Amino acid sequence: MAEAVLENVNVPAVVSKDECIYCFESPYNEPLALNASPKHSLNICLNCFQATCNRHVPLHIRVTEYACDTIHSNYLTIAKVEKPKQENVEENNNNKKIKLQVIETSEDDTHNTIWSLQRFNGENVPRTVLSKSTDSDISSTALEKIEKILKAKSQDFEDKKNSWVLEISTCPHTENFQIPSKPENTVNLNQCSSCDLTQNLWLCLHCGNIGCGREQIGIDGHSHALDHYRSNNNHPLAIKLGSLSSSTYDLYCYACDDETRFPDNVNLGSALQIYGINIQEKIADEKTLVQLQVEQNENWQFRMVDSSGKEFEKLSASKNYGCGLINLGNSCYLNSVIQSLVNGGVPNWSLDFLGSKFPLDVVYPDNNLKCQWIKLLNAMKCEPELYPNGIKPTTFKKCIGQNHQEFSSNRQQDAMEFLTFLLDLLDKKFFSSSSSGIPNPNDLVRFMMEDRLQCNICGKVKYSYEPTEAIQIPLEENDEPQDMLERIKAYFEGQTIEFKCANCKEKVTANKKPGFKSLPQTLILNPIRIRLQNWIPVKTSNELSLPGLIDRDDMLDVSSYLSQGFDPQTENLLPDEDENRSSFTPNQCSISQLIEMGFTQNASVRALFNTGNQDAESAMNWLFQHMDDPDLNDPFVPPPNVPKKDKREVDEVSLTSMLSMGLNPNLCRKALILNNGDVNRSVEWVFNNMDDDGTFPEPEVPNEEQQQKKDLGYSTAKPYALTAVICHKGNSVHSGHYVVFIRKLVADKWKWVLYNDEKLVAADSIEDMKKNGYIYFYTRC
């Protein structure tokens, strides 16, 4: 019977066998008592090779009965049982180990695998066990097929391999590298040529100079390798001697100011031999740049003890607190944002309309956004008690980030940028204009922002309005403690700018002043903690004092910033001559990122305008192509409006380029429309959406109400209470560590609950929220 079931099974190279596709059940068990049965197991479908727990096998069968030609009823059930640990000094070491790579080793060393081949006959019907691991009469053919499934790489393993590995590419200097002539004198590989350091040594591949590197995390360095490049700017490539091995090395290009690699190791090996180094015989004996970066990120720890050194009270996963989210390597930014939304940082934010039941027409839920939200919310809100050690949001992260270059990577990201990305994604997927009456929870944080522009010569004014999700508050450029209320006041006082007045017909100065046209249910404040030091963007840790950190009843009052709008009794509007100018509001998160990279405000706005206000990366690429433009850093004025093209028109050259790759014409056209004509992103979209039919729904004719901007927020003011704070430690928002504090009732008392990845504790200290607060959530009372 087993042979007949397995005969036509084709085993893929990678099998999803780490957790259930509908929940977070895994096959892993602690050591078992004698004759005890494992508590946890997964059933690998022999048709689609997806894993389901015992609870959800009937659901998968119903789904395949509804959506597939055949019912998926045959499964390989596996359970992994941990072997009793042997005493080992390293295992007993309490110091936290940093896992830099996932070494491809068998689980046979740590776990015993129990398996059985089973046929499920329907709900409430006993399953048929066709064969099991203890059987002695199973044929070699069937056993070979089962072993192939068990030995196949797991999807989790494939993801982990890249968790801490930097994505390093070649550069023009490695691609065009010419092997140098052998130096006349023997190179001393044991000491810096400019000082007495014997570690952190870098070899110039062009001449053999040995220079020490930069000082890094407790490692001495005087940057003599960099000094050598500055004196010899045609010598950009240097390799770290202590990192050399047959499989890895640290190579830095000073011209590109980035890590790099050779297209292959042939040129590298030949160059090293010139200096008497055989890379095949080398064993790395110093930390690599990857290790140093990971160690630095891991060192950004948040206090888990109070001021007296006592550990914070640990909280168990429950419906009140939810459950923890395990860090996937660099996913703490995602964990903090999700906890903020789901666990009360934005009160009443909910996706309850999705329900808790999975749709029957989705066979592969890992790639379906609705299914991933249902899976996540079921664990965090409906049954968190099942996951006392937290859950891994692996498939959730992959699903939401699959079409975004940054959020699909394993690099650390800016939590504020991710929050806005997530809200936009939910809008597009669940709350588009065609949605019928579903309240959008994202509107809880939205409001209308007013910009009042008054000419300092003629005194006439212009008002403009824009829907907004957060306010980014500039801080003073110092290291002193600052009062957030003073910074908010300074922000709403506005600034003096230059502009061409439509009434005065000349370039003049004007006062540009923001104000609230309406107020949100939850107000998000994002202090700008980035400033330039010696043209290098540095994240600050100014201590901020603000309402609500200590006393819940200490409210934020923003009523004085609620604008009354245009007053015809005391104000005169500017003429409408400037209406031929397009209204453009740049994405503030992208502006902050570009400024962090060292670009000016004017250049950043200009770049975002010319790239469709898409994202910082597109704008950055545009800036690199226009660095020589004489007006790049001049104040930016949007050009006059031109008749808009049909949004469904595409550039024929771009379309032809994609069609030459053999791609479906309808998909190509749709991809170019969705990606604003970007060919690279469009090609990626096509490959990620091969099951799309390439058609657009018929455009709706908007009625008068729909043509008006949706009313957002409240027209009257009320006090705001602080409900959550996302904190960040690190030198940049793209490194370090994120956590979130959410105010909750703990034993009938309001306390701050710290969500630090999978750890949940009641925290009494507010120091981290003062010095490291990055996103503050204030909710209307």
Swiss-Prot record:
Catalytic activity: Thiol-dependent hydrolysis of ester, thioester, amide, peptide and isopeptide bonds formed by the C-terminal Gly of ubiquitin (a 76-residue protein attached to proteins as an intracellular targeting signal)
InterPro entries in alphabetical order: Papain-like_cys_pep_sf, Peptidase_C19, Peptidase_C19_UCH, UBA, UBA-like_sf, UBA2_scUBP14-like, Ubiquitinyl_hydrolase, UBP13_Znf-UBP_var
Alphabetical GO biological process terms: negative regulation of gluconeogenesis; proteasome-mediated ubiquitin-dependent protein catabolic process; protein deubiquitination; regulation of protein stability
ZnF region ranges: UBP-type: 169-279
A Pfam family: UCH
Binding site for Zn(2+) 2: C192, C195, C212, H224
EC class (word): hydrolase
Cell compartment(s), UniProt: Cytoplasm; Nucleus
EC number: 3.4.19.12
Sites where the protein binds Zn(2+) 3: C204, C207, H228, H235
SUPFAM superfamilies recorded: Cysteine proteinases, RING/U-box, UBA-like
Keywords of this entry: Cytoplasm, Hydrolase, Metal-binding, Nucleus, Protease, Repeat, Thiol protease, Ubl conjugation pathway, Zinc, Zinc-finger
Domain of life of the native organism: Eukaryota
Keyword DNA repair attached: no
Disulfide-bond pairs as recorded: none
Active site: C332, H737
Sequence similarity: Belongs to the peptidase C19 family.
Additional information: Present with 3040 molecules/cell in log phase SD medium.
Protein name as it appears in the record: Ubiquitin carboxyl-terminal hydrolase 14
Species, as recorded: Saccharomyces cerevisiae (strain ATCC 204508 / S288c)
Annotated gene: UBP14
